[in-house]
């Protein structure tokens, strides 16, 4: 009997050791040197919820060359930063109840922060928390007139202060997209540096357009340029931008519902690669033969210099 108990304890210890080693090896590999990880969102075509996607379902191309997917896994934990442009018309606060519902519908593995874009900076109102009711309490009326700024500089400020992480990271920007510091003629000069920073840090930037308090934002061409910059920012970071014409949306709910589905169908793709002697960006493409499924992903990734 004693011998059987001893053997059982040894077997249990070996099993636990194998589990711990396996988990550690997976985590170490995902964040190890010579590897790059990017977030991929599976999207069901024609509003169909996408099925689960396995590593074998994915074809990955780096600079047009088929490249092996080293690791493909569900992104369980998410850090979602909500950045609200403080120059928005105060009527946007009519949408806050829907935004609160979106917060509260997120799983406990989602950590939400709330910040306001003002004077080229991200003013933090609530740090990351999975207490979604607490995050919702940070929603307030925007300042409106007099708070004109650059949402792109505020995004850069937010990302520069965001610690590195192997988990999924997204930003939801609610803004007109108008750059009152440097203009949108024809595009804000800070858009490129913003999406490149996001690509380096593997951050998706989603956006919802809302008009700001300045009457000039209601002019078609100015609003159109702002929307174009928001759309480009989303496209370059593997996300989407939501708007309906240049007027204020009647409701954020359809956008937030779609965003919730996207966030629930994200994966982390890891591949082996580096930039050689000098860091660089490389174009990527991700496809699948699964029916009714397509991917949202950044069109290029950052390859750090070889160590």
Go through the PLM ranges and name each one:
Residues 1-8:
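N-terminal secretory signal peptides that target proteins for export/translocation
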Residues 11-24:
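Bacterial N-terminal signal peptides
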Residues 29-307:
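Scaffold/interface architecture of coatomer-like assemblies
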């Amino acid at each position: 009997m004693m011998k059987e108990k001893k053997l059982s304890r040894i077997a249990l210890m070996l099993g636990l050791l194998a589990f711990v080693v396996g988990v550690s090896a997976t985590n170490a590999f995902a964040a190890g040197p010579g590897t790059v990880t990017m977030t991929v969102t599976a999207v069901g075509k024609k509003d169909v919820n996408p099925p689960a996607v396995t590593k074998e379902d994915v074809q990955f191309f780096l600079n047009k060359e088929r490249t092996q997917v080293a690791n493909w896994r569900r992104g369980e934990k998410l850090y979602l930063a909500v950045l609200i442009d403080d120059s928005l018309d105060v009527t946007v606060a009519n949408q806050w109840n829907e935004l609160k519902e979106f917060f509260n519908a997120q799983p406990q593995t989602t950590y939400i922060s709330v910040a306001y874009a003002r004077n080229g900076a991200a003013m933090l109102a609530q740090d990351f928390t999975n207490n979604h009711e607490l995050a919702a309490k940070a929603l307030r009326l925007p300042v409106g007139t007099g708070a004109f700024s650059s949402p792109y500089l505020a995004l850069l400020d937010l990302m520069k202060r965001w610690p590195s992480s192997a988990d999924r990271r997204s930003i939801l920007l609610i803004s007109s997209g108008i750059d009152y510091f440097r203009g949108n003629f024809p595009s804000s000069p800070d858009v490129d540096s913003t999406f490149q920073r996001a690509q380096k840090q593997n951050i998706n930037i989603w956006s919802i357009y809302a008009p700001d308090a300045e009457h000039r934002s209601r002019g078609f061409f100015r609003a159109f340029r702002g929307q174009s910059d928001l759309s480009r920012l989303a496209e370059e970071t593997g996300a989407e931008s939501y708007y309906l014409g240049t007027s204020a949306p009647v409701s954020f709910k359809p956008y937030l519902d779609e965003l919730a589905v996207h966030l629930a169908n994200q994966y982390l793709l890891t591949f082996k690669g580096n930039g050689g002697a000098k860091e660089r960006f490389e174009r990527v493409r991700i496809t699948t033969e699964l029916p009714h499924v397509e991917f949202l992903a950044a069109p290029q990734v950052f390859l750090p210099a070889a160590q």
